[in-house]
């Protein structure tokens, strides 16, 4: 069953585009981009999620990330 979001596709795409533009503008290599985005996720969890829920949120995020990564050999 498809998941429904409380956020519009347009809003999500706008934010994604803005974040990608910042990384592209700074010619950020992939490893640094992943490091910065990972640190951002960690900071969001640590500052915006109740301590009792942090591990569950992090696990859910990691599982969603793994599920969304393509096994396609092209890059």
Curated annotation (Swiss-Prot):
Chain segments annotated as transmembrane: none
SUPFAM superfamilies cross-referenced by the UniProt entry: YejL-like
Signal peptide annotation: none
Domain of life assignment: Bacteria
Family: Belongs to the UPF0352 family.
Protein name, UniProt field: UPF0352 protein Ent638_2783
Organism: Enterobacter sp. (strain 638)
């Amino acid at each position: 069953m498809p998941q429904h979001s409380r956020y519009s596709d347009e809003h999500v795409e706008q934010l994604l585009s803005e974040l990608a533009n910042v990384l592209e503008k700074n010619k950020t290599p992939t490893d640094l981009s992943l490091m910065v985005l990972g640190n951002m996720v960690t900071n969001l969890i640590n500052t915006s999620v109740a301590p009792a829920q942090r591990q569950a949120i992090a696990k859910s995020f990691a599982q969603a990330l793994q599920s969304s990564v393509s096994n396609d050999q092209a890059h």
